[in-house]
């Protein structure tokens, strides 16, 4: 019995110790011992033996939960490891796919360039063979004629043979001249082929911009046509309302004249009293009619101006051009004015009708001559009303005329096309920007072409292309600026662009020694990629950061070291800052001047050598003919 109790006590001690170690961890290892656990268990046994079984159950539950948590932690660790492995595999697959795509694009571009070069070479070879064949046929004819002349006696047909030989000699010289011109044209065409490629790219971009502008103009025109239709509909409604107002005014005037005739008021007095300078000392019974007629003439002067047929026709003629434009003003106020005029005329008509009824009786046929006299007397005042113009019409007309300016898109586009034709007619020189990554090539190009600087530019992938026109020695010079990527994986692409370059802008960072040390590698790459010596401008960029780095005791590249390295390779040298724009244009101008000078020298040497070779050939032909 005692052994069982002791064994159970030891088991409980182990359970308690294991549970507390799992819960407390390192703190249990540092401070909790088995003796303390046994002491705690003995105290519980002595104080309250009934708590032993619940205590043991609690300990077992603790152990079970600890095991479950440890199992879950292991599962989570396994899952995290699997996810990391999967992500690494996917990343490697993406890198391989990107490299494959880059390689495929590079191979395709190489094949295209090779195919184009082979086609051009085949055409030149075919032309050369054709011309050589023609010359050989001519030579054979000459030899044949010489043999015939030897066989024939010297006395027979000497004059004819000399003439024939002279003609053949002239023809031979003409053919040689044409051959020289053809070879010269081929050389010029070959030099202009690159310019035409760049021109094609520019024209495609310009055509896309023109299509976008035309699309915008089409949308604007459709919206303007819709607005014109709305304005024409409103104009027709206004003309209809004017016709109604005219008929209402005629009826109102006739009834007014009749009522005045009933009250034994003369037309002259009525008109004089209705004028702005009416007599304030008139009799009291006529005060109502004078005030009514004066207010009527003041409120309806606008409608009277539109009731006259001539004035209405002039108004319609003047409004025809305005219907083709949108003034940009709302027409809601016009509708409100029309409704107010209709309401006023309706009220005046009712007031006049009530006045006529209060006076009693209708106008007789004998009143017609008086009415005619009144109309004749009132023609002057009506004519003045018919020539009425609203205040501010001149100002509004000037505003509308100033806002209705002709659309200058076509003229601007024509000017742009003319300027483009002027630019593209010149030779374009290809300048390649090279250097390590993050030396500021893209910022340099943006400052040169757009006069802008962005501090958060992204890395160039592959090659970027810009055009820039500069005045070099008083002449417009077109530059094709190719911004190459500086990363290691894009070096092969950059090297391929050196092959047809006319000049190189080799940039390094004055605050980064590694970019300066890699300049030698870039120069070797340029020399390997070109079949001739081209000008190189060594540019120390980010010169504005040198003072800051010197203040922080960081190593920078001095201008003396850059100039010394440039002298070693026979290159130009300049320090620039794309941030503040210092020496950016000057560096490109110096390089463009050197490129232009060297290209002109090469062209002159090629033409001279070509002329010399043709003269040697002609001399050999003459010697052959004379022999």
From Swiss-Prot:
InterPro entries: P-loop_NTPase, Rab, Small_GTP-bd, Small_GTPase. GTP binds at residues 438-443, 541-544, 578-579. It holds the Pfam family Ras. Its main location: cytoplasm. The keyword GTP-binding applies. SMART domains: ARF (SM00177), RAB (SM00175), RAN (SM00176), RAS (SM00173), RHO (SM00174). One of its GO terms (molecular function) is GTP binding. The keyword Membrane does not apply. One of its GO terms (cellular component) is perinuclear region of cytoplasm. CDD domains: Rab. Residues 55-245 form a coiled coil. PANTHER family: RAS-RELATED PROTEIN RAB (PTHR47977). Homodimer. Interacts with the dynein-dynactin complex. Belongs to the small GTPase superfamily. Rab family. Binds predominantly GDP, and also GTP. Acts as a dynein adapter protein that activates dynein-mediated transport and dynein-dynactin motility on microtubules. NCBIfam families: small_GTP. This is Ras and EF-hand domain-containing protein homolog. It comes from Mus musculus.
């Amino acid at each position: 019995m005692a052994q069982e109790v002791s064994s159970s006590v030891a088991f409980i001690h182990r359970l308690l110790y294991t549970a507390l170690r799992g819960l407390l961890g390192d703190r249990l290892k540092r401070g909790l011992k088995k003796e303390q656990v046994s002491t705690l268990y003995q105290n519980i046994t002595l104080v309250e033996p009934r708590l032993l079984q619940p205590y043991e159950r609690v300990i077992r539950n603790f152990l079970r939960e600890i095991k479950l948590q440890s199992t879950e932690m292991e599962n989570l660790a396994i899952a995290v490891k699997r996810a990391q492995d999967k992500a690494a595999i996917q990343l490697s697959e993406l890198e391989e796919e990107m490299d494959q795509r880059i390689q495929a694009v590079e191979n395709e571009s190489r094949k295209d360039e090779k195919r184009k070069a082979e086609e051009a070479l085949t055409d030149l070879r075919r032309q050369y063979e054709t011309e050589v064949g023609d010359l050989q046929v001519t030579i054979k004819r000459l030899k044949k004629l010489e043999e015939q002349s030897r066989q024939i006696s010297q006395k027979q047909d000497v004059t004819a043979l000399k003439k024939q030989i002279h003609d053949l000699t002239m023809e031979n010289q003409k053919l040689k001249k044409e051959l020289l011109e053809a070879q010269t044209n081929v050389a010029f065409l070959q030099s202009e082929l690159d310019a035409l490629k760049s021109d094609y790219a520019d024209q495609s971009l310009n055509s896309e911009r023109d299509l976008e502008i035309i699309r915008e103009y089409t949308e604007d025109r459709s919206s303007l046509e819709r607005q014109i239709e709305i304005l024409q509909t409103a104009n027709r409604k206004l003309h209809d309302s004017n016709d109604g107002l005219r008929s209402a005014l005629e009826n109102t005037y006739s009834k007014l004249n009749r009522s005045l005739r009933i009250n034994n008021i003369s037309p002259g007095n009525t008109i004089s009293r209705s004028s702005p300078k009416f007599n304030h000392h008139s009799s009291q019974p006529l005060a109502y009619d004078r005030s009514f007629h004066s207010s009527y003439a003041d409120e309806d002067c606008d409608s009277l101006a539109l009731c006259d047929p001539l004035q209405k026709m002039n108004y319609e003629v003047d409004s025809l051009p305005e219907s083709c434009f949108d003034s940009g003003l709302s027409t809601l106020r016009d509708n409100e004015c029309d409704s107010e005029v209709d309401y006023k005329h309706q009220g005046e008509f009712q007031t006049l009708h009530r006045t006529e009824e209060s006076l009693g009786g209708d106008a007789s046929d004998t009143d017609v001559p008086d009415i005619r006299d009144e109309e004749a007397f009132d023609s002057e005042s009506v004519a003045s009303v018919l020539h009425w113009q609203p205040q501010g019409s001149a100002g509004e007309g000037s505003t509308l005329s100033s806002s209705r300016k002709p659309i200058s898109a076509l003229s601007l586009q024509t000017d742009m096309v003319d300027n483009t034709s002027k630019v593209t007619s010149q030779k374009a020189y290809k300048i390649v920007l090279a250097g390590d990554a993050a030396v500021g090539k893209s910022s340099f190009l943006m400052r040169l072409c757009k006069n802008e600087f962005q501090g958060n530019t992204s890395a160039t992938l592959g090659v970027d292309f810009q055009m820039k026109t500069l005045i070099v020695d008083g002449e417009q010079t077109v530059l094709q600026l190719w911004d190459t990527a500086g990363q290691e994986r894009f070096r092969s692409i950059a090297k391929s662009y050196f092959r047809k370059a006319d000049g190189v802008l080799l940039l390094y960072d004055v605050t980064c020694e590694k970019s300066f040390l890699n300049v030698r590698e870039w120069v070797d790459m340029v020399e390997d990629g070109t079949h001739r010596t081209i000008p190189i401008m060594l540019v120390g960029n980010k010169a504005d950061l040198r003072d800051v780095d010197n203040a922080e005791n960081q190593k920078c590249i001095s201008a003396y070291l850059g100039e010394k390295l440039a002298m070693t390779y026979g290159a130009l040298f300049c320090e620039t800052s794309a941030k503040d724009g210092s020496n950016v244009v000057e560096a490109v101008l110096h390089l463009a001047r050197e490129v232009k000078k060297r290209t002109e020298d090469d062209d002159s040497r090629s033409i001279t050598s070509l002329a010399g070779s043709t003269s040697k050939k002609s001399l050999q032909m003459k010697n052959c003919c004379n022999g």
